[in-house]
Amino acid sequence: MDITSLTAVELGKKIKAKEISVVEAVKASIAQIEKVEKDVNSFVTLDKEGALKRAEEVQKLIDDGKLTGPLAGVPVAIKDNMCTQGMLTTCSSKILGNFRPMFTAEAVKNLEEAGAVILGKTNMDEFAMGSTTETSYYGPTKNPWNLEHVPGGSSGGSCAAVAAEEAPYALGSDTGGSIRQPSSFCGVVGIKPTYGTVSRYGLIAYGSSLDQIGPVAKDVTDCATVLETIASYDPKDSTSIRRDSYDFTSALVDDVKGMRIGIPKDYFGNGLDAEVKENILRAVKVLEEKGAVVEEFDLSLVKYAIPAYYVIASAEASSNLARFDGVKYGYRTEEYEGLHNMYKKSRSEGFGPEVKRRIMLGSFVLSSGYYDAYYLKALKTKALIKKAFDKAFEKYDVIVAPAAPTTAPELGKSLNDPIKMYLGDIYTISVNLAGLPGITIPVGKDSKGLPVGMQLIGNCFEENKIIQTAYTFEQTKAYEAPELAKEDR
């Protein structure tokens, strides 16, 4: 039996049935990481020793009947912007290259309490700023489907790790599409929950009003199970919402009869690759054949999402990243004259070019004389976009959209063209601005053999509708792993 080809829930069942031990599961993941990591570069930190020690502890708790959940004993990879006590947490930046947090992020803690074994921390765009995982100080992650292409970003390490079967599932964070877009590029499933569903405590902030942690896995069942485990009300996060229910697995039902699905005309016009469009519309046809009612509608306001997002996110980032100054933790320049020079040199040497670009942009839009013209206008635009979605959800249960305008671009193509990189988030950003849930599922491949993902968007707190729709489509299409993951089997 090949352990790494199992989904997280399948592996959990086999551990429970004593067909596989937790140590065997962890060793299988470590062996796969050692086999493909030189090509893919999904991880910034691999904690072999800690994972094996934890595997033995978890096995004992399972044997004693103290851990019975579906993810008990299943290994996981964590995006490197979530604090893990005692384990390096770098945000893929030089400035945090030596940072070991004193506490663990709430979402990660929830997983640990459910018996998860952390394999290590995954690569990402520096401070989650980017769409290709090329801005990482620790080198780019490569797409397991084609090593000359990017995995997407900023959670590219998490999505590539799942696609390459280095981990059964992973956690990512999504500020403007950072779970959904790389999931599409890597042919895996990723959920960005409603804002406030998963605690942000211990997530190193980029854009606080937009950031949300979510799962990445091989199928919808895994994602729903992980989301059910990490979602919780947390008084330590002032934006955390006490929900009536955190039950997402009951939505794993193969039925879309009567489900009203809206297709925004504005998402399927110019700028969308023909093969991506064809694959998504084919998937919509499948849902229609299964009884869904599909209709086109107008959502023209979304064209203002990108400028609004980059003003708001950069403004919040310039404030959030002020704490990295070389004083309390992280990198400090070796030679400096006086305090201000130390700040300046530590930040200039510690941050990469994309992070500096966004800090400067954010500082500019918040400066006196420009605040009203940019930041305030962006906040008003955000409110209008939310209203447009509210109106759409009066009529539709689920909105279908692409996750990205193309399949995964080649390495280096977007990195040198910031506008091109920013436009890559065109279909995902509005979901963050409106605080909505979204899921990406693989629906096919283009002529180069690269995965195409379809994004399903739901109303606030209606994850179950998008999970049910995604699950229904998934019953018609078996999961496919890239050749790189299957070599030597």
What are these regions (language model features)?
Residues 29, 51, 104, 223, ...:
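Residue-level signal for inorganic ion chemistry
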Residues 119, 293-298, 439:
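General small-molecule cofactor/ligand-binding pocket signal
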Residues 71-91, 253-262, 315-386, 437-453:
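Short helix-loop capping/hinge segments that flank enzyme active sites or metal/cofactor-binding pockets
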Residues 71-213, 266, 315, 401-419:
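Short glycine/serine-rich loop/turn segments
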Residues 25-29, 308-309, 355-363:
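Short alpha-helical scaffolding segments that buttress acidic/His motifs in well-ordered protein cores
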